[in-house]
């Protein structure tokens, strides 16, 4: 456990929760938690960092401990998305007040363990899920086939699981980074 975790995540680990919000976690708490992981670069899309306007407000987490990977070579291991991408990703109805989605790259094996089928078979299962439901682990509506899962507004049912999946995704990103370094050295 990280010493600088938001208090809510610490409380959830020990089986307690804030009474005022039934265990819900804010997007700020998630951003602070993931940003506190070693080697994480956090980018919140904005006009100032020349991100496309459609992404403004969305947060992307990359593992780049040396902070030297070119931006066009960074792949996030998790994101926090706060609005729909019209024409691309609208099934979660993120334009509702107070709704955000945590997206986590769990990999093929993790995806299959969580959902019971491999990511490559997601299209056959797509209609089984309510992508607008809150506090439920679901396949990512657009990137499930690449091993991504999502939770809208994690709360009592999913906040502990989301934290663990974020930790696992970070560890997976670390391993991928180390493999890239090893490949360059051989």
Where are these regions (language model features)?
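Conserved short hydrophobic interaction patches
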Residues: 33, 37, 125-126, 168-173
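Short, conserved beta-strand/beta-arch hydrophobic-aromatic motifs that form part
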Residues: 60-143
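Well-ordered alpha/beta subsegment
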Residues: 129-186
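Charge-rich, low-complexity N-terminal segments
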Residues: 2-4, 9-86
């Amino acid at each position: 456990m990280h010493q600088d975790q938001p208090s809510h995540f610490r409380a959830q680990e020990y089986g307690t929760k804030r009474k005022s919000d039934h265990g819900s976690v804010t997007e700020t708490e998630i951003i602070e938690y993931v940003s506190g992981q070693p080697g994480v670069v956090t980018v919140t899309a904005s006009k100032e960092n020349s991100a496309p306007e459609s992404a403004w407000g969305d947060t992307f987490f990359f593992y780049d401990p040396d902070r030297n990977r070119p931006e066009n070579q960074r792949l996030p291991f998790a994101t926090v998305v706060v609005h729909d991408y019209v024409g691309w990703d609208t099934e979660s109805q993120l334009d509702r007040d107070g709704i955000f989605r945590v997206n986590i790259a769990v990999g093929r094996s993790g995806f299959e363990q969580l959902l019971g089928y491999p990511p490559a078979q997601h299209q056959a299962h797509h209609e089984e899920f309510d992508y607008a439901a809150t506090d439920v682990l679901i396949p990512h509506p657009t990137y499930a086939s690449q091993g991504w899962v999502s939770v809208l507004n994690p709360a009592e049912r999913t906040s502990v699981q989301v934290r663990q999946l974020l930790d696992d995704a970070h560890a997976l990103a670390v391993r991928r980074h180390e493999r890239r370094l090893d490949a360059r050295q051989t």
